[in-house]
């Protein structure tokens, strides 16, 4: 079943491209990029109502895990 989002592909792509551009501008290596994005994620989740944090964290981890390509030939 396809995932339906309340955001347009354009909104998503624009924001993602802006974030990637900033990381590239700073020549951030993978580990630094992941550290920063992880902290941003934590700050966003901690800004939510406490009752929602655990559930959204579990959904986020599940989505991240399922979206990672585990094939060895990706790059």
Swiss-Prot record:
Which segment of the chain is annotated as a signal peptide?
Answer: none
Q: Which NCBIfam families match?
A: PRK13689.1 (NF010242)
Q: Which family does it belong to?
A: Belongs to the UPF0352 family.
What domain of life does the native source organism fall in?
Bacteria
Report the InterPro entries cross-referenced here: UPF0352, YejL_sf
Protein's UniProt name: UPF0352 protein ASA_2693
């Amino acid at each position: 079943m396809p995932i339906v989002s309340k955001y347009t592909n354009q909104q998503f792509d624009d924001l993602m491209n802006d974030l990637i551009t900033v990381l590239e501008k700073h020549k951030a290596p993978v580990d630094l990029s992941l550290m920063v994005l992880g902290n941003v994620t934590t700050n966003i989740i901690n800004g939510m109502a406490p009752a929602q944090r655990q559930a959204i964290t579990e959904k986020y981890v599940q989505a991240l895990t399922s979206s990672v390509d585990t094939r060895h030939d990706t790059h």
